[in-house]
């Protein structure tokens, strides 16, 4: 990756031949590298060449001649330091820098959105679903209630505008949408080097790697954090991207042949790669819902810490952006239950009962178990209990779930989690017995029947394998969905025991 202060560290009076050689190696379409060169050598011949190139890349001639746009080497150094950050210190640009970038960015397409002027959370909540400026919205969520919030919003927004200018510098005026996507991928993931954080870090600090200011400060982000940055820049380029959210994930899409996987440097992955045994189809989100997903991610941190009041508060705020979302309602009701606020739990779960989740095949046991009186706050806490990566943590969870099941044998969610935990521990016999017991209470769950078919095959139990195989085939036909995992399992069974195979021969 381009090193931030390579040029700044060079001698102030280098040999002209060396300068000529150095400049010839700069990417002519990289606005940042041209700016670095000019910022360090403004009075040299090559520095003036860089200045001329900067004016060309910024398309200064297309701007209003009355707008004050003056190239300033010191100002450029500050802007570049803000984009190529080497510390997590918050970005705070002065007014001249902000005004300078704003004057250069008046043609950014996000300026036509009503949401580009929002300054409070109320503005966002009441704003039009598809007229939200995602960059401004995320900055309002982060800073809107702080005394100096407006200054911070404008400062970070200037950095977003500057980043969009850097992407535009690589594009012709007739650039296609596909070319814009490729230019954004190059700038974000290669020139700036944005990366997915280490697994151990992102699990503990998912809020840090989700909120847009933190993503800009760290140049790292989880799928949602980098997708928010990507979408904010796309709006400035006039790109209308679709937003999809498989459970626990998010990706963007220009069209079905060009999806954007922000955890893998923007590569395309087919829609089928995001579907699974549990997920029949994908939720398509609005710009407003995208902001709500950030609050949703924040709440998971407090849920993990068992701060159920704070988690519930954030889930409530997320619902203002994503009304009637089944996953948020389930987690909100669960937080209320674990906090022993039964009246609020009843209100939320009553609402959830009326909502049909079309995209998921997995049955929701928690709501039904609550109304049947099978569930307890302590039992639910065991289900949501976080586990470490070590084996002992899983073993301890299995012991806790065993105790919960013994105390509440009809609590299906606990029994399901116990079976899955046994699977993770490779205790296949125990997993089979636990899930088969659950099957007597819930025989219409495709995921459950898939696991029982797989475990029967692992145990080489032909009668049970064929029994559950037929049930699985019935359920996937009923739901009109045949995921790849099921296809592979059925092929494996057919290969081992072909149809019409007589074991007595």
Question: Where in the sequence are the language-model features?
Answer:
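Sec-dependent signal peptide recognition
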Residues: 1-7
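A structural boundary/capping signal
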Residues: 12-505
């Amino acid at each position: 990756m381009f090193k931030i202060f390579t040029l700044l560290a060079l001698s102030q009076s280098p040999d002209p031949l060396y300068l000529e050689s150095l400049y010839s190696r700069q990417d002519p379409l990289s606005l940042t590298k041209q700016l670095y060169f000019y910022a360090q050598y403004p009075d040299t011949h090559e520095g003036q060449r860089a200045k001329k190139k900067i004016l060309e890349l910024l398309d200064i001639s297309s701007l209003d001649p009355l707008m004050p746009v003056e190239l300033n080497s010191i100002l450029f150094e500050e802007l570049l330091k803000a984009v190529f950050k080497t510390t997590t210190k918050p970005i705070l640009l002065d007014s001249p820098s902000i005004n300078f970038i704003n004057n250069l960015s008046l043609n950014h397409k996000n300026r036509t959105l009503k949401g580009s002027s929002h300054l409070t959370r109320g503005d966002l909540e009441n704003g039009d679903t598809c007229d939200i400026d995602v960059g401004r919205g995320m900055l309002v969520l982060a800073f809107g209630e702080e005394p100096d919030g407006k200054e911070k919003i404008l400062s970070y927004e200037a950095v977003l505008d500057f980043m969009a200018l850097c992407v535009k510098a690589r594009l012709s005026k007739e650039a296609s949408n596909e070319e814009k996507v490729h230019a954004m991928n190059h700038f974000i993931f290669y020139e700036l080097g944005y990366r997915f954080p280490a697994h151990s870090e992102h699990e503990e600090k998912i809020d840090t790697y989700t909120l847009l200011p933190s993503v800009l400060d760290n140049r790292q982000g989880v799928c949602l954090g980098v997708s928010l940055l990507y979408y904010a820049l796309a709006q400035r380029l006039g790109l209308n991207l679709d937003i999809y959210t498989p459970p626990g994930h998010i990706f963007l899409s220009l069209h079905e042949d060009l999806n954007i996987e922000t955890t893998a440097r923007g590569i395309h992955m087919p829609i089928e790669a995001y579907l699974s045994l549990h997920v029949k189809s994908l939720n398509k989100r609005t710009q407003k819902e995208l902001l709500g997903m950030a609050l949703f991610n924040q709440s998971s941190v407090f849920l993990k810490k068992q701060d159920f009041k704070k988690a519930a508060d954030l889930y409530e705020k997320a619902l203002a952006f994503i009304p009637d979302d089944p996953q948020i309602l389930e987690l909100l009701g669960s937080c209320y239950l674990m906090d022993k606020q039964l009246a609020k739990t009843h209100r939320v779960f009553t609402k959830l009962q009326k909502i049909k989740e079309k995209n998921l095949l997995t049955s929701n046991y928690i709501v039904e178990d609550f109304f049947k009186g099978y569930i307890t706050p302590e039992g639910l806490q065991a289900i949501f209990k976080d586990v470490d990566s070590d084996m002992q943590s899983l073993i301890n969870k299995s012991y806790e779930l065993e105790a919960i099941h013994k105390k509440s044998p009809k609590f299906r969610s606990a029994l399901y989690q116990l079976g899955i935990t046994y699977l993770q521990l490779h205790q296949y016999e125990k997993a089979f017995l636990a899930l088969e017991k659950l099957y007597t209470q819930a025989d219409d769950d495709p995921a459950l029947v898939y696991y029982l078919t797989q475990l029967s095959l692992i145990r080489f139990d032909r009668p049970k394998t064929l029994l559950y195989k037929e049930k699985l085939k019935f359920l996937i036909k009923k739901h009109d969905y045949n995921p790849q995992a099921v296809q592979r399992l059925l092929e494996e069974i057919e290969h081992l025991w072909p149809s019409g195979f007589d074991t007595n021969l």
